[in-house]
Amino acid sequence: IALSTPNGVGNWFHKTWVGAEEGINDWNFIKLHWNLHPERNEDWRKEQDKLLGPSLAAQECDCDFITSGQTVIDGVILDEYREKQCQDPLEKRGVDSNLWIWQPPNYTKDYVLSADVSRGDGSDYSAFHVMDIETMEQVAEYKGRMSTKDFGNLCVNVATEYNNALLVVENNNIGWAALQQCIDRGYENLFYTSKDLKYVDTEHQINNRYRTQDRNMVAGFSMTMKTRPLVISKLEEYFREKSVIVRSNRLIDELFVFIYNNNKA
């Protein structure tokens, strides 16, 4: 027996519930809505909104996965993205078939490849996304497990294929192992950040390329206590304003479980 209120989507309880509804696992599902209780009515439900807030009230009262959970990006928005924008890739490449392609390179366009590096020991995934800079459309994605060295090489190979895309690799901890591969292979359009994190000159970066000998620059992007809230705020803004085009169901699944915990994402 597994007893719970909904708490977002993409987690074990949600996947097990959906599987039971579709009849693809051995679980039976029973939904007990709040209005089955003889002493509860619409006035009680409205009072729960006031006491708990709309999101937590949806979680505790409505048996609604989409509007439950403290997701950074509103679940309704993510569901809309899945319905209207997500597509099967045109091609799946690589030994693990985890490099998904929605659009081949257009050599009149500029692209950015943003990469997040995992340890490569099976406990987490490394991932990157390739975006068309002008249209903000996702054109390729990788999510899988491989060594940091192999992942660094894959980043360089795909960035080179996509018109020498601006290659942005997070440089925290294990990210340096993948970054070193990019540096050793002499990839020219590698993203550099100022060491004091006071600025990121995007126009200069894209058009002129930073020189690796600039002493005030460090390879990659540093996700710190200073930059993380800014990145998360901009991510939420892009989705809320529909400024970005997302093709990947895998990415939407990840965002459904990207939640606030003690006011931190």
Which ranges hold each PLM region?
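Beta-sheet entry/capping signal
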Residues: I1, W27-F29, Y111-V112, A127, ...
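Hydrophobic residues at beta-strand termini and immediately following loops
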Residues: L3, I30-L32, C61, V139-Y142
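ATPase catalytic-site recognition across NTP-hydrolyzing enzymes
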Residues: H37-A115
